[in-house]
Amino acid sequence: MKPMILFSVWLAATSTAIAQPTKTVGRTIPLPATGSVTLETHNGSIDVQTWDRAEIEIHAGIQAAGTWSDDVRRFDQTTVDIQSTADSVWIKSRYPTFTTWTWFGSNARIDYKITAPKTARWTIYDHNASVDVRGVQAAITIETHNGRVHLSDVAGPLRVGAHNGSVTGDLASFRGAEFTSHLGSLDLTLPSTAAFHLQADSRRGSVQSDFPLAIRMLGRRHTTVDGEVNGGGPSLRFHSHAGKLRLQSKN
């Protein structure tokens, strides 16, 4: 019986010892409905939701990449920098700068959950992170590298640049958009009554649309589209190298 008890205690202690260190950062800051939010991060996730309050709630969960001493050291040096003015908030993930002792190990992961006024403007820069934005009714700018972007129930002007990533969007209405993609894909769902002017240029890629459009092939690897949908309206521009554009309609 004793060996079994000792083994159980040792196993429990080992499980506790190998848990990856975590910490959280949380703040609530006044932000008017016409304010702006800028977020810059690397390695993690961003979850943006909206409400009608004149404030922004920020929650960041930080987790070490592993349990090795170099991973833990990097985790200890990782912080979230939050600055604000009367109508703007800046959020930036801060990782340890390069020194001889930070050569080994991996940076910590930071997962953001943020709720802000639905009409606040957003600018997001991310590398190797997933981005989910829901309910924003204002301008959104996103630059992503090696990431995934999903937009749902958004209704503001959009500007998205993606390198080696995918972008999906379900738009409540359309007020203009520009997408630039390299080795990525864009799958966009719009109301069937949406009126817009599509300008698409895809090299070594493809363009597919539920909306009636004349798709022109300039050679085997160059696809262009320039046409109006439902009488025309705000511009939808898509520029891609080795990327795919898919436009779907919804009732």
Give the residues covered by each predicted segment.
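Intrinsically disordered, low-complexity terminal regions
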Residues: 1-251
